[in-house]
Structures are given as structure tokens and as C-alpha cells.
């Protein structure tokens, strides 16, 4: 079978205005970026206010291998499958970050015959939203440092600047730097830090804003530093909210593309799920719900990260009520959780796979704790043995878990028909999801409830630094915000080497920070990096342009 790139390059795309017409988007709200992609003006929402919402289906997964387990592929394939059974459907995805594209994981446009296109463009720059987010973030940083340099009228303590610069690239050398060295004319020398753009608060704010005016309010209250007398300094205080919003004027509008089978798809926003909240924008999701009867979306990594934040942060804020959850599992990831090493995952091992099913079971229990109907999707890989797939199907049936095989990678929508029909069945029953915690709970209680209910961690240890900051956050009223856990995606615990379903383990809360603009408190567990590094052999070294002008090496 061809590579993802070859399949995408061979695809015949429909003009994007035709895709918009299929989605019910009038031409006057379409802002074309060539023939294959467009932005949809947010003003369209004003005309859709009286339309009922469609059904929202969340795709999540078990704890993944480092290569990922195909949530995007399943999301896209399921949307195509629903379209094939004559449902009015849209998909909502996050925009890929260039860091992982050139690093290790790759893009987020699906795989095989379940892809969104134009694949190359989506993975590389797209409509410029990442650039706008990076620019808005770094504009705030520049205005902040300029204020300190120009007499420091706000009495900012340079050692307590919390706003970090960002770049949409994996570059470990920028994690800890010193700026304004050597000359006083360069500014006030201080320690600084870069995060990857998708971990920035601007990205989170974009994805949680309801419109451009809401974005300006949110960015204005974002905390950038503290004064010498321990008072927070905001973007409004340094008078940068208006300029940052101007930069984001076009980026606030969702991006419209299509799947290989021409299903309309929004791609908008892309916060990391192990650091930020891991969901596409509220704007795109709510617009899709007005346009389609079924909206399929994904949340990053496993249910312990993306799904928890989707339900406890995004849905609570945006007043969304999901109709069902698809839990993606792969034979190879289950074998990893059953003790098989990465290099041996292609070898059949039913015993290890069933041992690793405890990880799947925990994620199912997490979804059940939110009071939502679910179905397990076995995302098939070419090297899965029939014995392994049959054993997993039997395990699901014995535990009364709804299950379907998903073969979108090899067959597109045709490989997702069973899953599509079963998703329709489970969404026919009205449900009301229940968050894990109340926002009025204390910070400690919110964290503990997540650790106990979602991770299965009976013990939570708070560092002295965290306890001190919690008392400070209470004074500012930040203790009533939702919490956004920063944790390794590779384990239910904060230790990436603990596979399966760990028991009797401790979750270590090392630090907290406030994202007052986004509207949550970030809680750090273990050692989480906000600026990734490149692997020993980055994917980038195998990429290029051939003599015919075609890209190669991009998956």
C-alpha cells in the first residue's frame, strides 16, 4: 500500500466552495485560500442561532505508544462512514504542529484512506493560524520587556516574568535562555523560556473563545508577570490586548477542508493535550453542530488527558453535551501495556494483549464516570493477527463493552460502517454528562478527584511550592477555575515507564500556574516539557522536494 503522502497526493479534491455548499455554508461567508481550503467567517453563527445542535461524538483512546494509535484516522474514517450511511456529518480536528511533523510523531491529518486533504498544506503552514498565534504571543512578550526597559512603570520583578516566548518547532536549546545580554541598550537582562506554540496560552485562549471580542477579554486578563510586591500583571496592564487581537483577526475564523471522501471538515486550533487542554476550537465545534446532524471530534492522547479536559474544561465552558464517546484501542498498544517492548510489538502475543487490556478497561471506566455512552473501536493495523483481534472482541463481549472493528486506514469509510451504525444507535438515547468535579471545589480537591477517578491513583503528593502557590491563588480568586493537568501521555501515572493499569501509585504535583485568560489552572505532574526536543534522527532529515516538484518523506 502507498504511503499516506502518496495517497494524499493522488487524491482528486472537490473545489472547496462545493464542500462548503455541501456543509450548508453560504458563499458570502467563505474566504478562499486557493481552491482547496477556506476560512469560514465567524459571523455565520449569527444566522444559525435558531438551528438545533447536532450530536457530538468524541473520539478518545487508551494510553498510546509514541507513534500514536490513530484517533485522527478513526475520527476521519468515522465521519466518512457516517456519510456513507447518509448522515449529515462534519469532522472537527486540531491543526498539526510543525514541531512533531519534523520531529517524531508526524502530522495530525489521519492515515491511509482516512485522511483530510490537502495533507501537505494542512501539515505545513496551512492558513497561517500558527504564525498568527506565535506572533500575538511574542508581541506580548516584546511589549512586556519594553515596559521593563522603559523605566518599569508597573514595578515588574524581572525574575518573576511568567509569560514565555513561543515557536512552532521542537527546539530544546530554547527551553532556558538569557535575553538582553551584554549591552544595557538591549534591555534588562533576565532568564527567559520558550514553549512550543501549541503549549502557549494564546493557543488555549483561541480555542476557548466564543468570538473575537471574547478573545480580547480573555487575552487581556492573562497574567504575564508579578510585581515586586507580589501583584499579578496582566496583558491589559501592559496595554497589549488590542494589538494581540488585531493579529488574530483572521485566525479566529475556522478553516474548512475535506476528507479523501469529501466529507466537510473543520480544522481549527491545536493545543497539546499533555500540557494544554488538547481540543480544537469551541468556535469550530459549535459552528459544526449547527451545520451537521453529527459532529465527530477528537481530544489528544488518552482519555486520561484529552477526554478529561474536553469534558471538564471545554464542554463545561461552552455548554456542550456530548452524545457518545469512541474509545480507540490498538492491538500493538495493548501489547505494550502487557509488557511487550516497542521493537517486538509486531509479533503476535495474545496473552500480553489481554494483560494490557486492563489499560483499556480503566479508560472505559473513566468515560463511564462522566455518565456517557461509549463504544470501543479496534483500530486495525496490517500486522494485527486474527487471533489477537478475535481475543480482544471476545474480551469486550465478556465485559459487556460495545465494540466495533475500525479499518478506515485500509478501506476509508467502507471500513467504518459497523462503527458508524453502532455510533448512531448509542446516540439515539438522550444523556447528560456529569463532570468529575465542581469548579467551586478547592484546587486540592479538584486535583485529587481527577487523580483518583481518572488515573486510579490513591495517593497524591503536593510539593511545598505547590501548596504555597495554592494559598496565593486563593487570594486572587483563581481557586475557582477548572484545572488542566500536565502529565505524560504514555502512562496513567506521572511515570512514563509504568504501563498497563498501575496500582497503589503516587501522583506527584510539582507545580501549578495560572492561565487566567484561558480560564484554568495548569497543574504539573512529574517532569513535563513545554518545549519538546528533536529525536536523534528527526523525521525532517528524510524530507525534501523531488525533481517533479513533489514533496517526499512527509509520512
For each feature predicted by the language model, list its residue ranges.
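Flexible phosphate-sensing "switch/lid" loops adjacent to ATP/NTP-binding sites
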Residues: 1-555
Amino acid at each position: 500500500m502507498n504511503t499516506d503522502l502518496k495517497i494524499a497526493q493522488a487524491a482528486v479534491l472537490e473545489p472547496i466552495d462545493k464542500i462548503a455548499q455541501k456543509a450548508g455554508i453560504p458563499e458570502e461567508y467563505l474566504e478562499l485560500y486557493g481552491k482547496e481550503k477556506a476560512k469560514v467567517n465567524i459571523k455565520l453563527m449569527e444566522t444559525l442561532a435558531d438551528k438545533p445542535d447536532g450530536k457530538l461524538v468524541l473520539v478518545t483512546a487508551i494510553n498510546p505508544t509514541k507513534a500514536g494509535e490513530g484517533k485522527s484516522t478513526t475520527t476521519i474514517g468515522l465521519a466518512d462512514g457516517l456519510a456513507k450511511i447518509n448522515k449529515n456529518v462534519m469532522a472537527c480536528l486540531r491543526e498539526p504542529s510543525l514541531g512533531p511533523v519534523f520531529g517524531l510523531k508526524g502530522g495530525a491529518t489521519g492515515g491511509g484512506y482516512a485522511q483530510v486533504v490537502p495533507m501537505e498544506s494542512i501539515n505545513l503552514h496551512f492558513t497561517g493560524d500558527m504564525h498568527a498565534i506565535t506572533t500575538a504571543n511574542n508581541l506580548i512578550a516584546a511589549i512586556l520587556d519594553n515596559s521593563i526597559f522603559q523605566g518599569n512603570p508597573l514595578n515588574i520583578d524581572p525574575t518573576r516574568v511568567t509569560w514565555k516566548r513561543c515557536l512552532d518547532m521542537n527546539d530544546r536549546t530554547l527551553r532556558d535562555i538569557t535575553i538582553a545580554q551584554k549591552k544595557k541598550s538591549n534591555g534588562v537582562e533576565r532568564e527567559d523560556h520558550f514553549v512550543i506554540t501549541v503549549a502557549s496560552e494564546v493557543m488555549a485562549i483561541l480555542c476557548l473563545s466564543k468570538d473575537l471580542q471574547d478573545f480580547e477579554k480573555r487575552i487581556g486578563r492573562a497574567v504575564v508577570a508579578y510585581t515586586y510586591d507580589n501583584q499579578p500583571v496582566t496583558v491589559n496592564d501592559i496595554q497589549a490586548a488590542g494589538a494581540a487581537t488585531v493579529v488574530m483577526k483572521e485566525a479566529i475564523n475556522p478553516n474548512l477542508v475535506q476528507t479523501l471522501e469529501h466529507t466537510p471538515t473543520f480544522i481549527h486550533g491545536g493545543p497539546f493535550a499533555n500540557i494544554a487542554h488538547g481540543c480544537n476550537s469551541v468556535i469550530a465545534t459549535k459552528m459544526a453542530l449547527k451545520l451537521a446532524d453529527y459532529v465527530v471530534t477528537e481530544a489528544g492522547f488518552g482519555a486520561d488527558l484529552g477526554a478529561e479536559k474536553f469534558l471538564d474544561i471545554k464542554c463545561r465552558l461552552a455548554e456542550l453535551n456530548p452524545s457518545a464517546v469512541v474509545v480507540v484501542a490498538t492491538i500493538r498498544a495493548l501489547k505494550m501495556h502487557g509488557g511487550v517492548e516497542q521493537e517486538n510489538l509486531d509479533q503476535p502475543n495474545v496473552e500480553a494483549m489481554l494483560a494490557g487490556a486492563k489499560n483499556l478497561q480503566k479508560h472505559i471506566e473513566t468515560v463511564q464516570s462522566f455518565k456517557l455512552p461509549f463504544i470501543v473501536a479496534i483500530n486495525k493495523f496490517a500486522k494485527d493477527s486474527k487471533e489477537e483481534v478475535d481475543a480482544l472482541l471476545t474480551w469486550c463481549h465478556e465485559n459487556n463493552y460495545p465494540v466495533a472493528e475500525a479499518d478506515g486506514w485500509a478501506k476509508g469509510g467502507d471500513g467504518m460502517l459497523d462503527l458508524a451504525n453502532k455510533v448512531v444507535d448509542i446516540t439515539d438515547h438522550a444523556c447528560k454528562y456529569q463532570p468529575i468535579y465542581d469548579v467551586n471545589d478547592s484546587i486540592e480537591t479538584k486535583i485529587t478527584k481527577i487523580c483518583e477517578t481518572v488515573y486510579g491513583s490513591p495517593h497524591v503528593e503536593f510539593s511545598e511550592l505547590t501548596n504555597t502557590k495554592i494559598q496565593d491563588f486563593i487570594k486572587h480568586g483563581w481557586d475557582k477555575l477548572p484545572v488542566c493537568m500536565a502529565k505524560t501521555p504514555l502512562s496513567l501515572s506521572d511515570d512514563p515507564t509504568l504501563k498497563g493499569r498501575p496500582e497503589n501509585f503516587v501522583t506527584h504535583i510539582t507545580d501549578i500556574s495560572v492561565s487566567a485568560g484561558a480560564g484554568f489552572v495548569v497543574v504539573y505532574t512529574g517532569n513535563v516539557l513545554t518545549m519538546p526536543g528533536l529525536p536523534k534522527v528527526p523525521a525532517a532529515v528524510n524530507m525534501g522536494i523531488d525533481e517533479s516538484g513533489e514533496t517526499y518523506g512527509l509520512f
